[in-house]
Amino acid sequence: TNSGDEGDNDLNQNMYTVMSYVDITSGQNPMLPQSYGFCKGPMAFDIATMQYLYGLNPSFNNGNNTYTITDVNQTGTGFSCIYDTNGEDLIIYNGSKKVNIDLRPANIQNNTGGGGYVSKVDDQTVYIGYTISNGTIIENATGGTNDDTFHQIESVENILDGNNGIDNVIYSDDFSN
């Protein structure tokens, strides 16, 4: 395959694994500076591989953690995969743009959601966000002041705070762990 081939279900991109040569932002903006918009560490497939080879790390991010979505491209900002093992956790956005917060973890299958679902502001010029690793549960989400969309799993008791705007909640029974 060529270096721009995103593979089956578009899973061959660095949004889902650092081992990919396909930069998630290159198709959207080939002139994007290399100082932001990249994956910042191991992504869903990388984390699943490490867990398979070395076992789970039950004490990693085991407290109450907050993951903040921002809407300004800055040096060092990009995409991360959340690996969190315990606690009451929150994904939050404190801005005025529309935001999509997806609480579904990666299902590590060759299908949509295999590498995770992206939580980010609804702006094609902002290259910052999160996916959630397989087996990780994020309990809560808080949106911004605009019309937000939340994706949640029916079997998880989430607390969703939409703040202002006309917000949507999409329920899924897709909890493939």
Residue positions per predicted region:
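GD-rich hexapeptide-repeat beta-solenoids
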Residues: 10-12, 21-29, 51-74, 88-124, ...
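Stable alpha-helical elements in mature extracytoplasmic
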Residues: 15, 43-49, 134
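Divalent metal-coordination and catalytic microenvironments
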Residues: 19, 50, 138
